[in-house]
């Protein structure tokens, strides 16, 4: 675990480059439903591709958030917590990338922008103190959980592959929120939650198309 500021800086840069320019590799097998084949029409592939692109962007942002928060905290135990959560999100990043490839869809062209914006938010949250930083995690994961739940109703009913991935991601986000609460998160003020919701809406709307 890097301890010096210089070590953390280079680790943070490495994480950004890997997220944006290197094909991610999952440590956990991609979720699937045994015996459930996925046969989609062209229109359904387009629909699923757009939704999974949004989910992929969400995982790019998750990498940025956790990396920034790990960089900002001075608490070694909390840094390890953020690093572990980031590793979980790497699985999600790999799964969504794999599914995009299978659907013949591309990731968002604006991923560097999304990463930079999310990193800035994570760094700001981290500078405000560990309890607030953890509260930011709780609210983010709660919003992501709700977003993934909505995608389960929007994905084609017979897109079993995408649905299995989204369902597992949703379960993992619930666990991340609970872990952050146990680590000492404080609730964020309602105006902050509203701003986060508005920012997420912009991201999901744009990423659905670009």
Swiss-Prot record:
Coiled-coil annotated residue ranges, if any: none
Co-factor requirement: Fe cation
One CC-aspect GO term: plasma membrane
Keywords: Cell membrane, Iron, Membrane, Metal-binding, Monooxygenase, Oxidoreductase, Ubiquinone biosynthesis
Record text on cofactor binding: Binds 2 iron ions per subunit.
Record's keyword annotation contains Oxidoreductase: yes
Domain of life: Bacteria
UniProt-listed Enzyme Commission number(s): 1.14.99.60
Database matches in Gene3D superfamilies: 1.20.1260.10
Gene Ontology BP terms: ubiquinone biosynthetic process
Residue numbers binding Fe cation 2: 89, 141, 173, 176
Record-annotated membrane-spanning stretches: none
Topological type in the membrane: Peripheral membrane protein
Catalysis: reaction(s): a 5-methoxy-2-methyl-3-(all-trans-polyprenyl)benzene-1,4-diol + AH2 + O2 = a 3-demethylubiquinol + A + H2O
GO molecular function list: 3-demethoxyubiquinol 3-hydroxylase activity; metal ion binding
Residues where Fe cation 1 binds: 59, 89, 92, 173
Family to which the UniProt record says this protein belongs: Belongs to the COQ7 family.
Protein role: Catalyzes the hydroxylation of 2-nonaprenyl-3-methyl-6-methoxy-1,4-benzoquinol during ubiquinone biosynthesis.
Protein name: 3-demethoxyubiquinol 3-hydroxylase
Organism (species): Albidiferax ferrireducens (strain ATCC BAA-621 / DSM 15236 / T118)
């Amino acid at each position: 675990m890097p301890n010096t500021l210089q070590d953390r800086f280079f680790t943070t840069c490495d994480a950004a480059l890997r997220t944006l320019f290197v094909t991610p590799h999952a440590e956990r097998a991609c979720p699937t439903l045994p015996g459930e084949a996925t046969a989609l029409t062209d229109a359904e592939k387009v629909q699923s591709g757009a939704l999974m692109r949004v989910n992929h962007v969400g995982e790019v942002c998750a990498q940025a958030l956790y990396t920034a928060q790990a960089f900002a905290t001075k608490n070694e135990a909390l840094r390890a917590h953020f690093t572990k959560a980031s590793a979980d999100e790497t699985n999600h990043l790999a799964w969504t990338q794999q599914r995009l490839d299978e659907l013949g869809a591309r990731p968002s062209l604006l991923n560097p922008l999304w990463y930079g914006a999310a990193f800035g938010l994570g760094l700001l949250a981290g500078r405000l103190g560990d309890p607030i930083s953890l509260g930011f995690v709780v609210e983010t994961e709660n919003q992501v959980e709700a977003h993934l739940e909505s995608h389960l109703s929007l994905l084609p009913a017979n897109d079993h592959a995408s649905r299995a991935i989204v369902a597992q991601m949703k379960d993992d986000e619930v666990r991340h929120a609970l872990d952050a609460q146990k680590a000492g998160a404080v609730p964020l003020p309602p105006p902050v939650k509203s701003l986060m919701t508005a920012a997420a809406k912009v991201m999901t709307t744009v990423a659905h198309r670009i």
